[in-house]
Amino acid sequence: MPAAKHLAKSHSRVGAVVADVWSQLPVRDGSVHAIMDVFAPRNPAEFARVLAPGGEVVALIAHQGHLDELRDPLGILGVEAGKLERMVEQAKGHLELASEPQLIEYTMRLERDAIAAQVGMSPSARHVAPDVLQERLAALPEHMDVTARGQLVRLRKA
């Protein structure tokens, strides 16, 4: 994972782990001061186990409107309503909100290859046949303006 390697080299006190969140994370109990979760699954019980006192989870959760410009031409999944509320409910007993969620929204100008990579990392990669997706990607313009939209949430141990 190039991003994790880059992060780990950014400072002597920074570490990065890429792991299956549904397995035990390869770190000691109470040893992590910050967990960053970007458009990825969350395991509140496991996050709470590894968080140090005062530690936080910073999560970016896709919000309705995220990548909407790609939905029709590629046939990819939309973001379901109530995603943040479900995450907060699932975290009960493990994590609680540390601050009010913030809406983050901006437009990105993406090349077709970047769009393919973005879709390949998303749940849509498992819902559209690879050959169909490649055909649809080829029909896109070389560059597109695409909206990124998510909610930034800070959580701490309950």
Segments predicted by a language model, with ranges:
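Conserved Class I S-adenosyl-L-methionine
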Residues: Q102-A158
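Class I SAM-dependent methyltransferase SAM/SAH-binding core
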Residues: M1-Q24
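A short acidic, Gly/Pro-enriched loop at the edge of an enzyme's catalytic core
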Residues: W22-I35
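A short glycine-rich, Lys/Arg-flanked "PGG" loop and its adjoining helix->strand segment in the class I
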Residues: R42-V58
